[in-house]
């Protein structure tokens, strides 16, 4: 009996020793692991945070530069008669609309945002359908005169306008090396001052009409478009020629290179949008062949950039609403490259040529 009792005691002692050994080993390993933790763990955590912050800054830097800030856009009606060439300020715009007017001519509406442009023009009179695009850009609207329909619509639509007929220097002035009515000039600075004096808001939270891309858009599925010819009428056509080095298009009108009045540099653009919409003679009792633009609805078009073109749809639901430009194949809103854009609105029958 005594021997069994001793065996039991020794068994318990052995078990206790084994457990103590296991526990001691665990404590030793935990201590050693703690001692082996690198002293720069905190530094690594800080480095990760710095990388994340840099990535965030990089994302900010990728935001488009052409349309930013809360400066309210200023839309200026620009004369496009050959007697007005060369025009001033077009290379400083973020957006230009070119649309038919009477006599087969076109007129331009140039939009500036946060730009200090000393000479802009020649400024010409308003046509009512340009107001649709001033409204969708939430722009202050500058012009020199107006058609009867434009005058009526400016009033009824509550357009914040600046009419050169009612202003002298320094807001508008005439230059001596062009003949009237192709010689009225202005500047963004004097227009902004006049707008403030009239109590117009000069800041805007409105988003861009165009969906600017953060990364360069390459239309890999598009057709070749290194030269694009757009006939607006029997009288007027424009051609854009692509420069693969600058990745921009140079503008020609009626076969003539278009240059800037102030700098002599060629007029260029990063993006071109073509929209096909019919026009017809406006029955306004004047017999002056003034036009009406049928631009409410969904229309075919093209988006052109970096030497390629894709088919798009252009949808405008009302005069005030933004035009939505979508890929004709996918239905998705197109991404437009960071840079200025010319929107050419021409008749549905126009035969645009690509080379």
List each language-model region with its residue ranges.
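N-terminal Sec-pathway targeting helices
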Residues: 2-16
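Hydrophobic single-pass membrane-insertion segments
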Residues: 23-36
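A surface/extracellular/periplasmic glyco- and lipid-processing/surface-interacting theme
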Residues: 6, 35-97, 102-355
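Core subunits and conserved enzymes of cellular information-processing
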Residues: 18-20
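Short alpha-helical segments used as structural interaction elements across diverse proteins
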Residues: 1-2, 23
């Amino acid at each position: 009996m005594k021997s069994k009792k001793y065996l039991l005691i020794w068994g318990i002692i052995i078990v206790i020793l084994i457990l103590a050994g296991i526990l001691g080993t665990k404590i030793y390993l935990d201590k050693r692991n703690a001692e082996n933790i690198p002293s720069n763990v905190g530094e690594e955590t800080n480095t990760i945070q710095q990388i994340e912050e840099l990535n965030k800054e990089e994302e900010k830097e990728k935001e488009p530069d052409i349309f930013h800030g809360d400066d309210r856009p200023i839309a200026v009606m620009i004369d496009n008669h050959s007697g007005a060439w060369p025009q001033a300020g077009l290379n400083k715009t973020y957006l230009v609309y070119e649309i038919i007017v009477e006599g087969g001519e076109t007129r331009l509406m140039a939009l500036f945002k946060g730009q200090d442009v000393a000479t802009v023009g020649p400024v010409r009179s308003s046509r009512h359908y340009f107001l649709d695009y001033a409204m969708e850009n939430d722009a202050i609207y500058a012009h020199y005169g107006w058609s009867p329909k434009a005058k009526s619509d400016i009033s009824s639509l509550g357009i914040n306008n600046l009419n050169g007929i009612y202003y002298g220097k320094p807001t508008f002035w005439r230059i001596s090396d062009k003949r009237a009515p192709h010689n009225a000039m202005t500047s963004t600075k004097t227009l902004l001052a006049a707008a403030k004096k009239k109590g117009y808001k000069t800041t805007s939270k409105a988003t861009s009409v165009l969906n600017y891309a953060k990364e360069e858009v390459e239309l890999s599925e598009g057709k070749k478009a290194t030269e694009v010819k757009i006939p607006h009428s029997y009288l007027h056509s424009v051609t854009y020629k692509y420069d693969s080095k600058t990745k921009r298009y140079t503008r020609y009108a009626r076969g003539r290179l278009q240059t800037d009045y102030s700098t002599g540099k060629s007029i260029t653009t990063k993006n071109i949008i073509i929209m096909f919409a019919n026009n017809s003679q406006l029955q306004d009792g004047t017999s002056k062949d003034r036009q009406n633009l049928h631009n409410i609805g969904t229309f075919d078009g093209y988006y052109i950039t970096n030497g390629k073109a894709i088919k798009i749809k252009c949808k405008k639901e009302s005069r005030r609403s933004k035009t939505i430009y979508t890929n004709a194949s996918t239905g998705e809103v197109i991404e437009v490259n960071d840079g200025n854009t010319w929107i050419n609105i021409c008749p549905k029958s126009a035969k645009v040529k690509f080379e």
